[in-house]
Amino acid sequence: MNLKPLADRVIVKPAPAEEKTKGGLYIPDTGKEKPQYGEVVAVGEGKVADNGQLVQMQVKVGDKVLYGKYSGTEVQVEAEDYLIMRESDIFAILG
């Protein structure tokens, strides 16, 4: 992937949607929930604060993160789906 986010933006590869329920029933494509977690694949340089200093990003490439259901903008690069979002749209880093 040749995509570099700017400023405080992050590119996340969403986790695949669940194919079947815990009970073993297969979920049709129309019934699948969007995953709300994924892996960070690229990060920007950071945000410039009001005082002119660069605020470093807290997330890094490889982090597993939780984000809001409607966070980010969906993009497709080389037949892969990604989300571009601001770091502030990320709720938590999974340990």
UniProtKB/Swiss-Prot annotation:
Q: How does it assemble?
A: Heptamer of 7 subunits arranged in a ring. Interacts with the chaperonin GroEL.
Biological process, per Gene Ontology: chaperone cofactor-dependent protein refolding
**Gene that this polypeptide is encoded by:** groES
Q: Which PANTHER family match?
A: 10 KDA HEAT SHOCK PROTEIN (PTHR10772), CO-CHAPERONIN GROES (PTHR10772:SF58)
Q: Which InterPro entries match?
A: Chaperonin_GroES, Chaperonin_GroES_sf, Chaprnonin_Cpn10_CS, GroES-like_sf
Where does the protein end up? Answer: Cytoplasm
Record's GO cellular component terms: cytoplasm
- Pfam families annotated for this entry? Cpn10
**Protein's job:** Together with the chaperonin GroEL, plays an essential role in assisting protein folding. The GroEL-GroES system forms a nano-cage that allows encapsulation of the non-native substrate proteins and provides a physical environment optimized to promote and accelerate protein folding. GroES binds to the apical surface of the GroEL ring, thereby capping the opening of the GroEL channel.
Keywords associated with the record: Chaperone, Cytoplasm
Domain of life per record: Bacteria
What NCBIfam families does the database record attribute to this sequence?
PRK00364.1-2, PRK00364.1-5, PRK00364.2-2, PRK00364.2-4, PRK00364.2-5
The molecular function GO annotations come to:
ATP binding; metal ion binding; protein folding chaperone; protein-folding chaperone binding; unfolded protein binding
Q: Report the protein name in the record.
A: Co-chaperonin GroES
Annotated family: Belongs to the GroES chaperonin family.
